[in-house]
């Protein structure tokens, strides 16, 4: 028997998750009920996804075997206050919020429930997400495996210790923004060199995509792969020299440490 999935929130991340579980055949439209605040959002998502939507978060919580809290972190307390008396003890709660610990959910719900904490990222929208996952002691291995299987429809996922979840926020949750800035900067330089902008974005983005695949598929250290591109007295090593002079490594390092610090304080 298929699990009934509830999604409180149907913004970019909620929509990406719903699309992923349906496109991968892990859930049917009849298995899903989602909520959205505005009528226009409900109508739009119903048309795009073919699922049922409601304005009532309680009805989603009552419907679901697995309940995804797909709203922004600042709305979690409000949503939990609304649904806490509706959620059953057997229901699995899946959080996508940074900075909300497993113990925090016990405090907010006023009792210990089955909670799985995740940190997804926006590449889930194209089926290439990366997420960290941890669960409390009430979640069985079978239940965790079920959620991991669902998430595999839109993201790669790894189970980690909860103390590393804030690191996940910095290294994969927020990092698409850093990568987009890098792609944009490369494209700007290409445009300055005379390339049409649309073509510049394609060249820059594909270079990043291909480079990432080389790291994942070759097993080689990124430094070794970098060295393979840098010919003696060539163009690439001069570009690398400028990036080192301008502090590219330290800028990325410090930005991620700031992100990590903010996540820990949330």
What are these regions, as identified by a protein language model?
Residues 1-55, 191-192:
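NAD(P)+-binding Rossmann beta1-loop-alpha1 motif at the extreme N-terminus of oxidoreductases
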Residues 104-114, 130-167, 180-217, 262:
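Internal alpha-helical scaffold of NAD(P)-dependent oxidoreductase catalytic cores
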Residues 52-57, 158-160:
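Short acidic-hydrophobic, aromatic-tinged amphipathic segments that line or gate anion-handling sites
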Residues 168-177, 198, 226:
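A short glycine-threonine-serine/GTX helix/turn-capping micro-motif
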Residues 39, 49, 57-62, 66-133, ...:
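Rossmann-like NAD(P)(H) cofactor-binding subdomain of soluble oxidoreductases
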Residues 205-266:
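NAD(P)-dependent Rossmann-like dehydrogenase/reductase catalytic/cofactor-binding core
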Residues 32, 42, 60, 196-204, ...:
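Small-residue helix-packing motif on alpha-helices
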